[in-house]
UniProtKB/Swiss-Prot annotation:
Gene (UniProt): amyA
CDD domains for this protein: GH57N_TLGT_like
Protein name: Alpha-amylase
GO molecular function, one term: alpha-amylase activity
PANTHER family registered for this protein in UniProt: ALPHA-AMYLASE-RELATED, ALPHA-AMYLASE-RELATED-RELATED
Protein species of origin: Pyrococcus abyssi (strain GE5 / Orsay)
Family label: Belongs to the glycosyl hydrolase 57 family.
InterPro entries: A-amylase/a-glucTrfase_C, A-amylase/a-glucTrfase_central, Gal_mutarotase_sf_dom, GH-type_carb-bd, GH57_Enzymes, Glyco_hydro/deAcase_b/a-brl, Glyco_hydro_57/38_cen_sf, Glyco_hydro_57_N
Catalytic reaction list: Endohydrolysis of (1->4)-alpha-D-glucosidic linkages in polysaccharides containing three or more (1->4)-alpha-linked D-glucose units
Top-level taxonomic group: Archaea
Active site residues according to the UniProt entry: E123 (nucleophile), D214 (proton donor)
Statement: the UniProt record of this protein carries the keyword Nucleotide-binding: no
EC number: 3.2.1.1
GO terms (BP aspect): carbohydrate metabolic process
Pfam family, one: AmyA-A_glucT_m
C-alpha cells in the first residue's frame, strides 16, 4: 500500500540572558508536558535539539527532565540533533569557533547516551562553505528548509527526499523541512495534518516528509497551551500518527540506515522564506511585502514563489549598526583570545544569535538579551592587557579609538561625531552605551490594517498570522532617530527649542557635528576637534576625554567666531532600563541615577549649572504576542547658551 515516511522533530531554545520566569514558564507549558506525553506513546519517535543555553538551565534547575530524556534516548524514541552549543548562526562565526561550539553539544549528547551525527542549523542560515566545517565536526546530515532547495531550482514535488550537497570535495546529507507541515503543526486540527500526510503517500518506499520546528510552538506561542494540551491536540496527534498504517514514523538516522539520498544538489546562501523579508532594510522590506501580496492577489505567488528572494541573514549587520558593532567586537575577541581557555566560554556565549537580529520575536530590541551578550564580551575582553589602541573594529573602513584601563573600556568613533559608542565597565560587565536607535520598521505601517488572517480557520493562529494594531497612545509617541545613539553627541539648537520637539525628533539641528568627522590625537587620553558651521557662523568644538578608574572625564571648549543665538547640547545616551523614566527638564550640576536591575548606580557631574533635558528612548517592535514598546535607555542632554566661548567639564562616574 502507498505509505509516507514521516520524521518529526523539535528545536528547544531560550536566548542567552532570558528571564528566569520565562524559562520556568517555557518548561512548565512546553518542554515538560511534551516529553511526558511522548513517554506515553512508545511507538512515537521524535528528533530533539536542545540548545546548550537551555541544557545548562535544565541541568541546574530541572534534572528530572534530563533523566526522562535519557530514558527516551535509551528506548530509541528520541534522537538527539546538535547545533552550536550556545546557538550561534554558524555562518556568522569563525570556523574554529564553529567546531568548538558543535563539539561541546556533541559531548553533552554523549553524556546522555547518544552519539549525535545530525545538525539543526540555527535559523536555517545556510552557506555552502559550512559543509567542510560540519564534516570535520563529525556531522553526517543537516536539516534546512524546503525553501533552500526551491531556491536551487528544485520543484516542490522533488522535496520529499534528502539530498547530498558538496563543497571543496566534502559531502553531507541535507534534509528539507516541509513548510506546509510547519504551518499545519500544531495550529490546525489533527485531521488536516493526517490528510496532508496521506496525500503524500507513495509506492516509493524512500519518500519522506520532514517536520522540524520550534518546541515552543507546543505550549508557549500564544493560545497554544490550551490547544495543544488542554484540548488534547498533542495526544491525539501522537496517537494517530504513530498508529496509522500509511504513516511510517522514523528518525533521521533510521532513514539514512535504510535509504540513500536522492542525488546531488547545490544550495545557495539562504534561510527560511520569512527571513528574506525580515533581513531587508525597512523600506525594501515594505516593498517585498507589497510584491508578495500582489502576487497572491493575482494567484501567482505559489507558482512563482521560488523566484521571490529578499535579503540574507547577514543583512542584519547592515540594517542594525548596533548589531554589527556587537558582532565585530565578538570577532575581535575571538581572534585575540583563541588560545585563552579561561576566556573562550565568554566568547562562545556571546555568539548566541538572538540579540543580533529581529523578526517576529524581539531579538535586538530586547535590552536584557543585548546586555547578556555585552556581559560576556566584557568578561572576555577583561582577559586582555588594557591599553589604548586605534583600529577599525567594525569593518566600516574608518578607525575607532580604544581608551582602556583596568576598569573601563571606552570606544570612540572620531568619524561619527567624535562620540563614545562603547562605555564598558569591567567591574559590572555592562556597556553603558548600549542604547539602540529608534527606527521605522516596515510593519509599523502594516499594523494599522492587519487583522487575524486565521479568524475563519479551525485551530489557533501561528504567530505569523496574528494581526496587530498599534495602540493610539503609542502611535502618537512614535519617533524615529536621524542618527545613531551614543555618548558625547554634540548638538546645536535654536534658543527657543523645546524638550518635546527634541524628544520626538521634530527639532532642527543647526550644526553639522552629530555625524561629522572629528580630527583626533591619542596620548594619555583622546583629544578631538572639529570646525563646522552653525547658522553660517564658524564654530570650533574641542573635547578632551580621559578614562578614569571610576568612569571618564571630558573637557569641552566651544568657540564661535561671532555671537549666535543658539544652544549647545551634549547628549549622553545611557542604557538605563529598570527605571521607567518620563520626559523632564531639570536645572543643576549633577544627575544621579540608580538603575538597580540594569547598569547600576552612576552620576554625571558638571562644573557649572546647566539646563538638562531627560527623556526615555523607546522603540516599538513586534513580538510573538503583539507589540513591545520598550525603554532602550535614557537620553540626558546638557544644555548651555553659546556666548562666544564655552568651557565645560563633565565627569561620568560609576558609584
Amino acid at each position: 500500500m502507498p505509505r509516507i515516511n514521516f520524521i518529526f522533530g523539535i528545536h528547544n531554545h531560550q536566548p542567552l540572558g532570558n528571564f528566569g520566569w520565562v524559562m520556568e514558564e517555557a518548561y512548565e507549558k512546553a518542554y515538560r508536558p511534551f516529553l511526558e506525553i511522548l513517554e506515553e506513546y512508545p511507538n512515537m519517535k521524535v528528533a530533539i535539539h536542545i540548545s546548550g543555553i537551555l541544557v545548562e538551565w535544565l541541568e541546574e534547575n530541572k534534572p528530572d527532565y534530563i533523566d526522562l530524556l535519557k530514558s527516551l534516548v535509551r528506548k530509541g524514541q528520541v534522537e538527539i540533533v546538535v547545533a552550536g552549543f550556545y546557538e550561534p548562526v554558524l555562518a556568522a562565526i569563525p570556523k574554529e569557533d564553529r567546531l568548538e561550539q558543535i563539539y561541546l553539544l556533541k559531548e553533552w549528547a554523549k553524556k546522555i547516551g547518544y552519539d549525535a551525527k545530525g545538525l539543526w542549523l540555527t535559523e536555517r542560515v545556510w552557506q555552502p562553505e559550512l559543509v567542510k566545517t560540519l564534516r570535520e565536526a563529525g556531522i553526517e546530515y543537516v536539516v534546512v528548509d524546503d525553501y533552500h532547495f526551491m531556491s536551487a531550482g528544485l520543484s516542490k514535488d522533488q522535496l520529499f527526499w534528502p539530498y547530498y550537497t558538496e563543497d571543496g570535495g566534502e559531502v553531507i546529507t541535507v534534509f528539507p523541512i516541509d513548510e506546509k507541515l510547519r504551518y499545519l503543526i500544531p495550529f490546525r486540527p489533527v485531521d488536516k495534518v493526517i490528510s496532508y500526510l496521506h496525500s503524500l503517500a507513495s509506492e516509493d518506499e524512500s519518500k519522506v516528509a520532514v517536520f522540524h520546528d520550534d518546541g515552543e510552538k507546543f505550549g508557549i506561542w500564544p493560545m497554544t497551551y490550551e490547544w495543544v494540551y488542554e484540548k488534547g491536540w498533542l495526544r491525539e496527534f501522537f496517537d494517530r500518527v504513530s498508529s496509522d498504517e500509511a504513516i511510517n514514523i522514523m528518525l533521521y538516522s533510521e532513514y539514512l540506515q535504510k535509504f540513500k539520498p536522492k542525488g546531488l544538489v547545490y544550495l545557495p546562501i539562504a534561510s527560511y522564506f520569512e527571513m528574506s523579508e525580515w533581513s531587508l532594510p525597512a523600506q525594501q522590506a515594505k516593498l517585498f511585502v507589497e510584491f508578495v501580496e500582489k502576487l497572491k492577489e493575482l494567484n501567482m505567488f505559489e507558482r512563482y514563489r521560488v523566484f521571490v528572494r529578499g535579503g540574507i541573514w547577514k543583512n542584519f549587520f547592515y540594517k542594525y549598526p548596533e548589531a554589527n558593532y556587537m558582532h565585530k567586537r565578538m570577532l575581535m575577541l575571538s581572534r585575540l583570545l583563541r588560545d585563552n581557555p579561561s576566556a573562550r566560554r565568554f566568547v562562545l556565549r556571546a555568539q548566541c544569535n538572538d540579540a543580533y537580529w529581529h523578526g517576529v520575536f524581539g531579538g535586538i530590541y530586547l535590552p536584557h538579551l543585548r546586555r547578556a551578550i555585552w556581559s560576556n564580551l566584557i568578561k572576555a575582553h577583561s582577559h586582555l592587557e588594557p591599553k589604548n589602541k586605534i583600529l577599525d573594529v567594525d569593518f566600516d573602513g574608518r578607525e575607532e579609538v580604544f581608551l582602556e584601563n583596568d576598569n573601563f573600556i571606552i570606544v570612540v568613533k572620531p568619524h561619527y561625531g567624535g562620540s563614545i559608542f562603547e562605555l564598558s565597565s569591567k567591574r559590572r560587565a555592562v556597556n553603558y552605551a548600549d542604547v539602540i536607535a529608534r527606527r521605522w520598521e516596515h510593519y509599523h505601517n502594516l499594523g494599522e490594517s492587519e487583522s487575524d488572517d486565521n479568524e475563519n480557520q479551525e485551530g489557533v493562529s501561528s504567530i505569523h498570522e496574528i494581526g496587530k494594531r498599534i495602540p493610539e497612545d503609542i502611535r502618537k509617541e512614535l519617533a524615529y532617530d536621524r542618527y545613531r545613539r551614543g555618548i558625547l553627541q554634540d548638538h546645536f539648537f535654536s534658543a527657543n527649542e523645546t524638550l518635546d520637539r527634541y524628544r520626538l525628533a521634530k527639532y532642527w539641528e543647526l550644526g553639522d557635528f552629530i555625524e561629522g568627522v572629528y580630527n583626533y590625537e591619542v596620548g594619555n587620553g583622546l583629544v578631538l576637534w572639529r570646525r563646522g558651521k552653525v547658522l553660517n557662523v564658524t564654530v570650533d568644538v574641542k573635547k578632551s576625554i580621559e578614562v578614569r578608574e571610576d568612569g571618564f572625564s571630558v573637557r569641552y571648549t566651544v568657540l564661535s567666531e561671532e555671537d549666535i543665538e543658539a544652544l549647545f547640547g551634549i547628549e549622553l545616551n545611557i542604557a538605563v532600563h529598570s527605571i521607567k523614566e518620563s520626559p523632564e527638564e531639570l536645572i543643576g550640576k549633577r544627575i544621579k541615577v540608580n538603575d538597580k536591575y540594569g547598569v547600576g548606580e552612576f552620576e554625571i557631574v558638571l562644573n557649572k549649572k546647566a539646563r538638562i533635558w531627560k527623556y526615555p528612548v523607546k522603540t516599538l517592535s513586534q513580538s510573538e504576542a503583539g507589540w513591545d514598546y520598550i525603554q532602550q535607555g535614557v537620553s540626558y542632554t546638557i544644555i548651555y547658551p553659546i556666548n562666544g566661548r564655552l568651557d565645560i567639564e563633565l565627569y561620568f562616574r560609576e558609584l
